[in-house]
């Protein structure tokens, strides 16, 4: 794919005038003789990159003509003969995140030669790591006298987690700047970029860097001892912090709808279980189908933020098993299904159902008006819609309505409560789907934030088996915390490396890998897990696998080593794949006592391949030819090459044929 000057400037960190001076060229098929042989082959560029130019560092500098990084050997006031398009953007992406360490290895070059086409690509493996402190779990929930308060501890954890999942979020706003100590000095001290940072930060304390609020928040959330129960909901808070004004309205509305639905089904469940204990005042009962635009009244009645104290107080009214089903049903919207109900009596419910309205059943009336009502609701939001509203289909003829009413009567009388609750959820789900379609591309990333459903379903299964204990709760909390961090980081990498169209158009994601190492208080590795995925959707596929894997492993907590007959079933539960690391490490993870784990190290590795562009500027080609000839002669005489930036006069071009190829280089192709 052709590379424009603007694309090259964006992905190399250089200015547009610099790239216009450089004159980038991707396909050198009919231009090979304009360059020295070492500059056109993969082996030759590898030699130049490693021993002459040091491309792995040089690409991070300001390489404008006459810039400080270009003054002496080997550039002589000109840009280099090549640019690795996307490499500087990759390094900048990793530096802009809260990783503790970053490494870039295996910088290699490959060439593709065929009639009419000769190009060179670069590839690199990035490895970015940070550690989260999980050893402070005992401070998260009071574990004193745990066995006698098991139910209270479980309900406290659930309440805090549900409040985080359904809280009505607003982004943090403030004035001035946020500063983070000990960050931001990832560039070489003498580089032009570092000099610019130092000039900007004059008067600022040593080692501090001005950072966005969301980056400061995430650095804070890395330590469970420090953030305590604020860790719950970290991923969603960071997501809405980065959203634009339109996305903020849509995401907040989606969260309100989930909250309202959760409060609705909890109220209905509690009322069914205790019809005389929770009478509802008449003013709060909605009359259907007269309230045909019932969504606004529904939100007004039920979208109050979920309160942890009120959830804990539900212990007598709503069994934990039913509470978990309600949580899963609400959090999984717009997917999933309504919670199963065993009582079809709607007495004490939150809606006043009128069996017939003009000869038609309530649920059927709601279903027929659903699309038009949803469109009106979205149109009333203070956002500009991305899609033109399709007008609703005309109502069916009256003859059909009369005939259908007779057929519906018996079914509706039999299934009214169940069908009605299903219709409420279907309406909310369809509205959420429509709102998600209105999100901008950068905010439409729910595939990274659905992990909560896996963990709630795991606790639901444990509750059904009567297997809730300290070990399962400890692992549930710890892995939920790990999943929050994993989701946030993978979403960040997805947004910067796959969802940024300019980068994704030219740079290919070959492999993505997440390595999770649990360490004890002395730093020893307790177990290590590896997940690999390839292809364009590698980041989202990794999140789905990790979420399912960690949630399934929660159910094995406290059971010790797996028996032979259990291993195959466990591997099926975590959807084991051959590229998921050593099986013994997986079994060790399932059997370990989580009290031994003090911290979890998360490593995110990904391999990228991008294009190399060549210069068409004769002056740069000439300097490169003279530099390569001089370096080749020094190497032939077994002498050391000058250090980059050394004050070496530009050598003259020797007379005669070109110097011999460096080791490993191949002769020029002729077709």
Curated annotation (Swiss-Prot):
One GO process term, biological-process aspect: DNA replication
Post-translational modification: Preterminal protein is used to replicate viral genome, upon genomic encapsidation it is processed first into iTP and finally into TP by adenovirus protease.
Example of a GO MF term: double-stranded DNA binding
Chain span(s) of sequence motif Nuclear localization signal: 380-389
SUBUNIT field: Heterodimer with the polymerase; this heterodimer binds to bp 9 to 18 of the genome. Interacts with host POU2F1; POU2F1 binds to the auxiliary sequences in the inverted terminal repeats and tethers the pTP-POL heterodimer to the origin DNA thereby participating in the assembly of the pre-initiation complex (POL-TP-DBP-NFIA-POU2F1).
GO CC aspect terms: host cell nuclear matrix; host cell nucleus
Record carries keyword Membrane: no
Subcellular compartments: Host nucleus matrix
Modified residues (O-(5'-phospho-DNA)-serine): 580
Composition-biased stretches (Pro residues): 649-665
Assigned protein family: Belongs to the adenoviridae terminal protein family.
Protein name listed in UniProt: Preterminal protein
Keyword DNA-binding: yes
């Amino acid at each position: 794919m052709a590379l424009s000057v603007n694309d090259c400037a964006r992905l190399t960190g250089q200015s547009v005038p610099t790239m216009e001076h450089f004159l980038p060229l991707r396909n050198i098929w009919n231009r090979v003789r304009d360059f020295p042989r070492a500059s056109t082959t993969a082996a030759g560029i590898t030699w130049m990159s490693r021993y002459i130019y040091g491309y792995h560092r040089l690409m991070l500098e300001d390489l404008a003509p006459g810039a400080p990084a270009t003054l002496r050997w080997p550039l002589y006031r000109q840009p280099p003969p090549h640019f690795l398009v996307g490499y500087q953007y990759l390094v900048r992406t990793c530096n802009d995140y809260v990783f503790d360490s970053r490494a870039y290895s295996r910088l290699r070059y490959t060439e593709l030669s065929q009639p009419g086409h000769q190009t060179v690509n670069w590839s690199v493996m990035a490895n970015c790591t940070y550690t989260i402190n999980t050893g402070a779990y005992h401070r998260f929930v009071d574990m004193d006298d745990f066995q006698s308060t098991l139910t209270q501890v479980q309900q406290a954890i659930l309440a805090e987690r549900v409040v985080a999942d359904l809280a009505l979020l607003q982004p943090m706003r403030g004035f001035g700047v946020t500063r983070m100590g000990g960050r931001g000095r990832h560039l070489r001290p003498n580089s032009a970029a570092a000099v610019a940072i130092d000039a900007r930060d004059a008067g600022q304390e040593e080692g501090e860097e001005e950072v966005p609020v969301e980056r400061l928040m995430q650095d804070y959330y890395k330590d469970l001892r420090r953030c305590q129960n604020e860790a719950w909901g970290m991923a969603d808070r960071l997501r809405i912090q980065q959203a634009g004004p339109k996305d903020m309205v849509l995401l907040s509305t989606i969260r309100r709808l989930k909250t309202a639905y959760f409060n609705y089904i909890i109220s209905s469940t509690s009322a069914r279980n205790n019809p005389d204990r929770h009478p509802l005042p008449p003013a709060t009962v909605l009359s259907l189908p007269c309230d045909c635009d019932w969504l606004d009244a529904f939100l007004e009645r039920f979208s109050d933020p979920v309160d942890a104290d009120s959830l804990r107080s539900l212990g007598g009214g709503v069994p934990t098993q039913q509470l978990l089903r309600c949580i899963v049903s609400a959090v999984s919207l717009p997917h999933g299904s309504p919670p199963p109900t065993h009582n079809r009596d709607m007495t004490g419910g939150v809606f006043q159902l009128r069996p017939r309205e003009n000869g038609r059943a309530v649920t059927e009336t709601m279903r027929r008006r659903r699309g038009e009502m949803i469109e009106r609701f979205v149109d009333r939001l203070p956002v500009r819609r991305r899609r033109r509203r399709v007008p609703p289909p005309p109502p069916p003829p009256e003859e059909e309505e009369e005939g259908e009413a007779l057929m519906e009567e018996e079914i509706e009388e039999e299934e009214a409560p169940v069908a009605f609750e299903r219709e409420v959820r279907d309406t909310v789900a369809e509205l959420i789907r429509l709102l998600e379609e209105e999100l901008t591309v950068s905010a439409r990333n729910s595939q990274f934030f659905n992990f909560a459903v896996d963990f709630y379903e795991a606790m639901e299964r444990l509750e059904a088996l009567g297997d809730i204990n300290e070990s399962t709760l400890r692992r549930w909390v710890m892995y939920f915390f790990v999943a929050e961090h994993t989701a946030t980081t993978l979403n960040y990498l997805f947004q910067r490396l796959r969802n940024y169209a300019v980068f994704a158009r030219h740079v290919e994601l070959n492999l993505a890998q997440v390595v999770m190492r649990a360490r004890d208080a002395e730093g020893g590795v307790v177990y290590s897990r590896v997940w690999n995925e390839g292809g364009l959707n590698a980041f989202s596929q990794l999140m789905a696998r990790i979420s399912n894997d960690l949630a399934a492993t929660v159910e094995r907590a406290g059971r010790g080593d797996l028996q032979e007959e259990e291993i195959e079933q466990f591997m099926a539960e975590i959807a084991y794949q051959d590229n998921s690391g050593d099986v013994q490490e997986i079994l060790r993870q399932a059997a370990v006592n989580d009290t031994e784990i003090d911290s979890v190290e998360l490593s995110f590795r990904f391999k990228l391949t991008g294009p190399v562009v060549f210069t068409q500027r004769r002056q740069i080609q000439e300097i490169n030819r003279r530099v390569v000839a001089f370096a080749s002669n020094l190497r032939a005489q077994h002498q050391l090459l000058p250090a980059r930036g050394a004050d070496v006069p530009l050598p003259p071009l020797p007379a005669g044929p070109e110097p011999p190829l460096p080791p490993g280089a191949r002769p020029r192709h002729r077709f």
